[in-house]
Amino acid sequence: MVDAAKKTQVSRLSTTEHISQFTFARQSVRFGSVHESGRMFSSFDDYLREFEKVKGFDGVQVRKGLEVDYIGKYGSEIGKVVSQKKWDVLLCSVHELPGGIDLEDKSLPQDRKSADDRWREYVETQKEAIKSDFIPFAILTHPERLAVGTPQAPKDFEDLMVELSKVAKEHGKAVELNGADLSRSPELVRKVASACGKTHCKVSYGSDSHYPDQVSRNYDLASKLIEEFHLEVI
C-alpha cells in the first residue's frame, strides 16, 4: 500500500483496518456485516507490527487507524476495544441497520416504501452514531453505502444528506467522499458533496482501497466536487 501511495504521489496514507477484522473483537461483538475474506488479526499488536515495516518510508506519512462500526447495542463493548490503543485516525462507519441487517444485502424488499423506509432508518442510525461518544472519531464514512443493497435512493436523498451533514457539523465531524462509491454511486456522492456545501460541513476524501491498485482511486473526481461546492477538507 505504501509503495502504491508513493507511486501515485500520495503524501499521506491513512491505514484503517475494519474493527471486525480482529478476532478478539468478534468474540465480544456480533457483527452483522463482515468481510468473508482478507487477513484477520489476532490482536492490535499484531496489526501495529505491520506499521513497523514501513517506518522511514521517504515521502509518505503513514497514519495508524481503524474503521469502526457503529452498532448501537454494542457501543460500550466496541468503545472499550478501540480505547486499548492510541490511534492517529478513527473512522466511524454504519455497515448494518438495527437488528444486524447488512446494508449490502440485495435480498431485502426493494419496493418504493421498503426502500425509502430503509434509507431513512440508515440516515437516522448515522445521526445516532455522530451524536454518540462511543469512540472519538473524526470522520463519518460512506454515508451513501446503503445503495449497494438498496440502489433505489429516495427522491429527497439530498435533503436527508443536508440533515445528516448538519448534525455532523454541529458535532465537529467530517463526512467522507468515498472513492469506491464514486465508482458505484457517483450521483449520490455528488449529492453528499452538495449537501456538505450547503451546511458548510467539512469533508474528507477516502479511497476505501483494499488493494494497492485502489490507492487514491477517483481522487480526481472527489477533487472536482470539492472545488465545485467549495468544500473544506480535513
Where are these regions (language model features)?
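An N-terminally biased module of ancient metal coordination in phosphate/nucleic-acid-related enzymes
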Residues: 1-72, 82, 147-151, 155-159, ...
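Short amphipathic alpha-helices and their capping/turn segments at secondary-structure boundaries
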Residues: 1-11, 73-88, 122-136, 164-166, ...
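Structural preference for beta-strand elements that scaffold enzyme active sites
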Residues: 12, 61-65, 88-91, 137-139, ...
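Short, glycine/charged-enriched secondary-structure capping and boundary segments
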Residues: 28-30, 77-80, 104-107, 154-156, ...
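Structured helix-beta-strand junction loops
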Residues: 57-58, 86, 171, 199, ...
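Hydrophobic alpha-helical segments and helix pairs
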Residues: 58-109
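Domain-core and long-helix interface of multi-subunit machines
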Residues: 92-199
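Long, positively charged, glycine-interspersed low-complexity recognition regions
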Residues: 185-234
